[in-house]
Amino acid sequence: MTSVLRLVLLAISALSILSILTPSPVLAQENPYIVAYDHYLEEPGNLEIEYFSTYGTQRGGNDFHAFWAEFEYGATAWWTTELYLDGQTTFKDSTIFTGVKWENRFRVLKGEHFLNPVLYVEYEHKSGADKILKEGEGHDVEADFLAPNSEARKEHINEMELKLILSSTYKGWNFTQNTLAAKDLSNSPWEFGYALGASRPLALKASAKRCNFCPQNFVAGAEMYGGLGDRHSFGLHDTSHYLAPVLAWNLPSGWTLRVSPGFGLNHNSHQFLMRWGVAREITGFGSMVSRLFGGHK
């Protein structure tokens, strides 16, 4: 699995060099959320490369550092597709590759509306050692992460996940609600979860000058997420829940930095999750690839 991680890092490095060499026009602001989704999709033909990291505390076991890379592509104006590569390091244990995920988001309505629905469909192949905690679902609790990597990686999970994203933007504020339903493709019941988010730029009026530290480059907010049990036991019993402030810094160069300290809200949750991420937009990536392989401009 070490060779896989090396290949992932090599791919990210190569694409990052390409992104630096590619001129970046003025881009739309990225939201600050790490778990919740709003209704904005990737621009058609653009590729966004993202790296995220989560440090998590573990009562009764070793703390961990989970990380994942995302490659998000705007296929059309109404469809964004994304590939995830996940890994984790459990302190005093080992570093392992934990899975892949293919995510698709579909915009249902054209234009802006008071409520903007987006359909989310995801397939995930992962091991039981996956710790990225990208969503809350079912009866997942902190104690589930106690197994050593050598044992947890033996469990193989093939999962389908569906979300209904309802998002609205009003006077600069974005409010979003995500409802989740996930199904292990083995003989397991449907599991449910939620994510809520609210955010706003620190300033709505853009500066006349290009600057890195202008208030409008910062988007702040909060998100809350957790599990809602499964088909046989729906509700809050034996579920975990988190509340996290979120902050995004959108640089004129096309880079976005995110940070989010998260706090467990009950005894089933990890007490503390520290998340951060960096993203870079490559505009016109689809056109560049088409030209490279002899397509039309």
What are these regions (language model features)?
Residues 8-23:
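Bacterial N-terminal signal peptides
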Residues 1-5:
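N-terminal secretory signal peptides that target proteins for export/translocation
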Residues 6-8, 34:
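Short helix-onset patch at the extreme N-terminus, typifying the N->h transition
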Residues 27-297:
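Transmembrane beta-barrel domains of Gram-negative outer membranes and organellar outer membranes
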